[in-house]
Regions:
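Alpha-helical assembly-interface signal, strongest on the long, hydrophobic N-terminal helix that forms
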Residues: 1-64
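Short, conserved structural patches
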Residues: 52-131
Length: 131
């Protein structure tokens, strides 16, 4: 009986790092889900703005405002086609506008050498405005 006094502490010390890594993984997966939802929502809002106006700067500012839980400075906004490309220049009504948002999310334990993961949100809308 005397040799088993510290057994529980030793078992706890051995399992604690594994438990912490599992908890960190669960939190990271939840963070990925939040980032994906935020990007999808922001892309939809930005595409809606782009379908009603012909202003890429307004589309970018709408995306930056809608991507609230994320750092807007790390979100890359890609608009296809751009403001000065066909069909948005000549006959835009009815053509498609695609807004793609990319966010490089840092991985916990990055010091191990793991790369950042890129999360993407995409939305497509028909252009409604006429020149």
């Amino acid at each position: 009986m005397r040799g088993e006094r510290g057994q529980a502490i030793v078992e706890f010390a051995l399992l604690l790092p594994l438990l912490l890594v599992v908890i960190l993984g669960v939190v990271f997966v939840a963070e990925l889900g939040v980032a994906r939802l935020a990007l999808e929502h922001a892309a939809a809002e930005a595409a809606r703005t782009g379908s009603l106006t012909n202003d890429d700067d307004l589309v970018r500012s709408t995306a930056a405002a809608a991507v609230k839980p994320l750092d807007a400075s790390l979100v890359k906004v890609i608009i296809e086609p751009t403001q000065n490309e066909a069909p948005r220049v000549s006959a835009p009504r009815g053509s498609l506008l695609r807004v793609r948002l990319r966010y490089a999310i840092p991985v916990p334990l990055g010091f191990v050498g793991l790369p950042r993961l890129t999360i993407e949100g995409v939305a497509v809308r028909r252009v409604e405005w006429t020149p």
